[in-house]
Amino acid sequence: MSRIELKHIDKYYGDNHVLRDLSLTIEDGDFMTLLGPSGCGKTTTLRVVSGLERPQNGTMTIDGVEMINAADAYYAEPSKRGLNLVFQSYALWPHMTVRENISFGLKIQKLPKDEIERRLHEALRMMRIEEYIDRYPNELSGGQQQRVAIARALASNPKLLLLDEPLSN
């Protein structure tokens, strides 16, 4: 993981002020949990950090590198942030096997085949889902699908891993 710092983040959806002056620092090696009732901004916070949402105010750095500066309308692309987000819905490709789902992003990065295979099998082993490698998402339980989504996120060796509703299954 890396040091991440958010300062004075504001996010609106229309007139709805979802994130109000959010400031937090997560140090390298920390584990942080966002707790709160439905609709309080937990998922929005993850989406801002990951680059899927742009706040109206505030800044964010990862390891001292600016990722968000709303005043300057600067927003680093999600692919430049060195992180992965596992969605509550898992977002698995239904027409791809577990192998293909986990390997997809690694192929997009144009990694060598032997490196893709190494990372694939390491992620499968870490999540204890080796026996599902040739199955499709609809052949898996919700908990198994969740582990595939986490394995896919871990396979790219992110500096930061964001999990939305990780205990839902």
Q: Where do the language-model regions lie?
A:
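ABC family nucleotide-binding domain
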Residues: 1-169
